Every structure is written in structure tokens, then in C-alpha cells.
Swiss-Prot record:
Functional pH dependence: Optimum pH is 7.0 in phosphate buffer.
Annotated protein name in UniProt: Urease subunit alpha
Catalytic reactions of this protein: urea + 2 H2O + H(+) = hydrogencarbonate + 2 NH4(+)
Involved pathway(s): Nitrogen metabolism; urea degradation; CO(2) and NH(3) from urea (urease route): step 1/1
Main localization (coarse): cytoplasm
NCBIfam families: PRK13207.1 (NF009686), urease_alph (TIGR01792)
Any Pfam family the entry gives: Urease_alpha
Residues annotated as the enzyme's active site: H324 (proton donor)
Domain of life per record: Bacteria
Sites of N6-carboxylysine modification: K221
Originating gene: ureC
Length: 571
């Protein structure tokens, strides 16, 4: 005998279903469920009197040897990803996403492709949003505490360079040479994130570059503070082509060795990741932003200029001075810093992100960026652009799915593709590492509820350890068992070059983490950037710094207020 309930009753029990819209935090963005994998009436739910009990949604006969039996099931999750906004159960096995589908007991339930057995644990995601762990590809490894801060914001992968609080690291994402790379690969064993390091890309002698790739670097960073000359860039790209690694470029702000055109002539048609493409973070003044129009440039923003607000310009001068070891008593140093801060290009940056011309967002951690705000600032830009520019094509009232898919791609799948790790991380897809973030919708983009890393809970909001229930105050982020003992290594990956992987660098250094080789990088182009691959004609007026897209001036007004801000940080 069937039982009918209202949609609001259903939603209160099992979360939203097809046609329901969910507001993201206190933004103006609404995600609408496109598909529900559930078989209505056969939902898997855990708790007293619920369906996941022996002989009901839990199969009493199966063992873990059955390939369909999950170690962990996340039930009734609303998944937001670059290519889907769906409701489903997520099966995890051996630390990897096994299946997205319908969980339960196939002996008594229809359409089950994830089996719950005696060996299965449950995380209830009814009414919650699930996303892939974020990827920050512009990290200065200045302070190891960055990792925990980033993790608690929903980031699970860091790519960049550094050796600690050295002047070189404070200014550049470089881990220079085999000795430093080996030391940092050993240090990564104690970090709760997936990690990849970039070496120093300045050397005419290819041996000095190649030895860093052999030592485990997943790419090379060419940075103006070490000399971003056309020659250095050309040699770095030659090595990158030989070893299938990425080049990250912080171009020449001072235009000493050439202008933007000379840099692009040196690049030719070879792919590279252009850091902070707007230019406030560094790069050819005033027109680095034009590089985003090239088919071989994968452009990203760093988060201090996102979104453009009434405070953005004022805070940037001091940030540039400190980060790049400049002296306020030297007029040329002041001029250097001042040349990078242009309100016109900053005002255009948000619009270029919204148009899908800029493909990624990253932090620039402690080097003009905030490591724990990549996700928050991405969604603030999305909110602000909807406020100023209206709905994107294909979106409608209470349905911002196209904009949401565009923006989530900026810190998940696109950075993964750019650095050759998209086979392992970057989306909620079968076969990928189970780096999964659960959010209460009201806190989406600001404070995750649970962080699953490699299939095990790594951190979560939890109460006093002496409390009688897990919600006893003070509620705060606490490390979980995924960060203890050998789990710290077994739940995360260290990314290395293919040549380092093939030469067993893990054995050489005694590494215990999962090592994975980066690959499929050198054939990339902008068209590989999901939902963010526009290549319009871009121009910058050299006198006024105004930005034009296909001949039309683009700009935005500075925000005076934003969502996802003070109300979330009262305590």
C-alpha cells in the first residue's frame, strides 16, 4: 500500500528532490536539483526507527569482498559539481568514490547499486550540500598551519612552493632544487592535504631545471622576483614540454625585459598557468589581463582582489610592499608597488570571472592572499555579479545552476586539469579520491560541517569532548581520526612528476603517502577549462587602464556590503 506525503514533508526527511531550490548561504544564489537517484519510498536513512537496519536497507548476508559493498555511504546528498547538481547516495570504498547512485539492500529494494552491509558506516547528508574538496594552486608554503586553516574552509589540495618563512618563499611559490624539494616532500607527510610542489624555473642550463623535476617537482614557477625574462620562460617551457609538467608564471611587472607582447612571443603556443592574471598580484603593468584571451593561457585570479570592494585598493599597497621585500624609503620601490594597483583592471576582474574568461581562483597564501578564503570569495564574486549583471543565459528565478557550475569549477576541476591531477581529484566522480565536503546550506561557502579526506573524516565541527552529546558547546572545528597515526599519510596524496614517480622517489625518501604522477598537461588549452573557456578579444587602454571585451568597456562597482561575512564570524 503506497503512502503519499507533501513535498515539504519529504524534503524535511530526505532533503531536496527534483525541482527544489536551495539557497547558498546568505547569497542571492539558488541551486536547483536536476536529478534524484532515489527510489521514492526506498530511501536509505540512518537512525532509530529508520531504514538502515539489518534485513531492511542493510543487507544481512554480504561481506566486504563484494565489490558493491561500500565502506562508507553518504546518504541523500545534494551534490553540487561542475557538471551536475543532483541528489544521490555516495558510496566510498578503500578511500575512493565507488559509486554515485542508490544505496540500500538489493534483496528487497529496487535500483540499488551501492550495497550497505555490516561493514558499512553512514554519514547522513539529508538536507546538506556535498562538494568536492577544493584545490588551491597558488600556495606559498610559509607556515605549516596554513594547511589546517585551508582544510577547515573546504580545501583539500595545495599546490605551490616554498620552504618556510624565507624571503624567497614569502615572495615566490618556489621550492628550489633537489635538497629543498626532498625536505618538503618529507614535511608533506605530516600535512592533512594533498600536496604538490613547484621548483624554480630560472636557469639557462637545463640540467638545473631537470634535476628539480627528477626530485619530484610537478612543475616550475617563473617569477619576476627571480627574473621572469623571455629567455628564462622559454627554457622553462622547453623542459616542461620534455617532462609533461606545468609552468606557472608571475610575469614582469616592471616590463624590464620586455612587455606583455615579448612574453607571449617567448611563450609561443605552449600552455602555461598565468597567475593573478588581473595584475595586482604581479605581472606586466598595465595589460597582463590581455593574456586571458590567448587559447594557450590558463588564467587564474588570486583572492585579495576578489570581489572588488570599497576597501580593495587601500589594502593592497602595503601588501605589495611587505610581500616583495620592498623599501618604503626608496621611491622606485614605491613606484613598483603603485604600478600594480589599478582600480580599472580590478573592477574588470570580477566581470571576466563571471564571463568565464578567467578560469580559476586561488589564494596566494600569506603573500597577498588569504589561504582560508578561496571558497568564500569565489561565491562572493558570484553573488556580486548576479547582483550587478543579472542572470546568466539559461538560468532563471531560483535556478542559478549555470552560474553555480561555472564558479565551483574555478576551485575544483579546472585547477586539477591545469596541473595534471584531474584523474585523482577535483570532482565528485567514481574512481577519484574521496575528498568530500559536507555543508549545511546556511553555511555554504563559509564553514563546512564535515571534511572527509580519502574516505575518512579528517575534521568536523564538534562539541566539548566531555559533553554528553556531540553538540555540547563550544562547537568548533576539531581534528578527527583521519589526521591521527598512519591515517595522515594513507588518506592523502603527494603529487610528483612522472619521472620522479617512475624512479620511485617514494622509496628513495621513505615516503608513506600515496604518490601519484601528474600527466596530460602539455596538450592542454583554454578549451579544456570546464565552464570557463571564453577567449574574447581583450584590450586595455594604456592611459586610463580601462578594459575592453570585444570592443565593449567592462567594469563593476565596488561592493559596500557582501554575503558570507560578519554574521558568520561572530564567534
Amino acid at each position: 500500500m503506497s503512502f503519499k506525503m507533501t513535498q515539504s514533508q519529504y524534503t524535511s526527511l530526505y532533503g531536496p528532490t527534483v525541482g527544489d531550490s536551495v539557497r547558498l548561504g546568505d547569497t542571492n544564489l539558488f541551486a536547483r536539483v536536476e536529478r534524484d537517484y532515489a527510489t521514492y519510498g526506498d530511501e536509505a536513512a540512518f537512525g532509530g526507527g529508520k531504514s538502515i537496519r539489518d534485513g531492511m536497507a542493510q543487507n544481512p548476508n554480504v561481506t566486504r569482498d563484494d565489490k558493491q559493498v561500500a565502506d562508507l555511504v553518504i546518504t541523500n546528498a545534494m551534490i553540487i559539481d561542475y557538471d551536475k547538481i543532483v541528489k544521490a547516495d555516495i558510496g566510498v570504498k578503500n578511500g575512493y568514490i565507488m559509486k554515485i547512485g542508490k544505496a540500500g539492500n538489493p534483496d528487497i529494494m529496487d535500483n540499488v547499486d551501492i550495497i550497505i552491509g555490516a561493514t558499512t558506516d553512514i554519514i547522513s547528508a539529508e538536507g546538506k550540500i556535498v562538494t568536492a574538496g577544493g584545490i588551491d594552486t597558488h600556495v606559498h608554503f610559509i607556515n605549516p598551519e596554513q594547511s589546517q586553516v585551508a582544510l577547515e574552509s573546504g580545501i583539500t589540495t595545495h599546490i605551490g612552493g616554498g620552504t618556510g618563512a624565507s624571503e624567497g618563499t614569502k615572495a615566490t611559490t618556489v621550492t628550489p632544487g633537489p635538497w629543498h624539494l626532498h625536505r618538503m616532500l618529507l614535511a608533506a607527510e605530516s600535512l592533512p592535504l594533498n600536496i604538490g610542489f613547484t621548483g624554480k624555473g630560472q636557469a639557462v642550463n637545463h640540467t638545473a631545471l631537470v634535476e628539480q623535476i627528477h626530485a619530484g617537482a610537478i612543475g616550475l614557477k617563473v617569477h619576476e622576483d627571480w627574473g621572469a625574462t623571455p629567455s628564462a620562460l622559454d627554457h622553462a617551457l622547453q623542459v616542461a614540454d620534455d617532462y609533461d609538467v606545468q609552468i606557472a608564471l608571475h610575469a614582469d611587472t616592471l616590463n624590464e625585459a620586455g612587455f606583455m607582447e615579448e612574453t607571449m612571443a617567448a611563450v609561443k603556443d605552449r600552455v602555461l598557468h598565468m597567475y593573478h592574471t588581473e595584475g595586482a598580484g604581479g605581472g606586466h603593468a598595465p595589460d597582463l589581463i590581455k593574456s586571458a584571451a590567448y587559447a594557450n593561457i590558463l588564467p587564474s585570479s588570486t583572492n585579495p582582489t576578489l570581489p572588488y570592494t570599497v576597501n580593495t585598493i587601500d589594502e593592497h599597497l602595503d601588501m605589495v610592499m611587505i610581500t616583495h621585500h620592498l623599501n618604503a624609503s626608496i621611491p622606485e620601490d614605491i613606484a613598483f608597488a603603485d604600478s600594480r594597483i589599478r582600480k580599472e583592471t580590478i573592477a574588470a576582474e570580477d566581470v571576466l570571472q563571471d564571463m568565464g574568461v578567467f578560469s580559476m581562483v586561488s589564494s596566494d597564501s600569506q603573500a597577498m592572499g588569504r589561504v582560508g578564503e578561496v571558497i568564500t570569495r569565489t561565491w562572493q564574486v558570484a553573488h556580486r555579479m548576479k547582483e550587478q549583471r543579472g542572470l546568466l543565459d539559461g538560468d532563471s528565478e531560483y535556478n542559478d545552476n549555470n552560474r553555480i557550475k561555472r564558479y565551483i569549477a574555478k576551485y575544483t576541476i579546472n585547477p586539477a586539469i591545469t596541473h595534471g591531477i584531474s584523474d585523482y581529484v577535483g570532482s565528485i566522480d567514481e574512481g577519484k579520491l574521496a575528498d568530500i565536503i559536507l555543508w549545511e546550506p546556511a553555511f555554504f561557502g563559509v564553514k563546512p560541517d564535515v571534511i572527509v579526506k580519502g574516505g575518512l573524516i579528517n575534521a568536523a565541527i564538534n562539541g566539548d569532548a566531555n559533553g554528553s552529546i556531540p553538540t555540547s558547546e563550544p562547537l568548533k572545528y576539531r581534528k578527527m581520526y583521519g589526521q591521527l597515526g598512519g591515517n595522515l599519510q594513507s588518506t592523502s596524496m603527494t603529487f610528483v612528476s612522472t619521472t620522479a614517480y617512475e624512479n620511485d622517489i617514494g622509496k628513495l625518501l621513505g615516503l608513506k603517502r600515496k604518490l601519484r604522477p601528474v600527466h596530460n598537461i602539455r596538450k592542454l588549452s583554454k578549451k579544456d577549462m570546464k565552464n570557463n573557456n571564453a577567449t574574447p578579444d581583450l584590450d586595455v587602454d594604456p592611459q586610463t587602464y580601462e578594459v575592453f571585451v570585444d570592443g565593449e568597456k567592462i567594469t563593476s562597482e565596488p561592493a559596500t556590503e557582501l554575503p558570507l561575512t560578519q554574521r558568520y564570524f561572530l564567534f
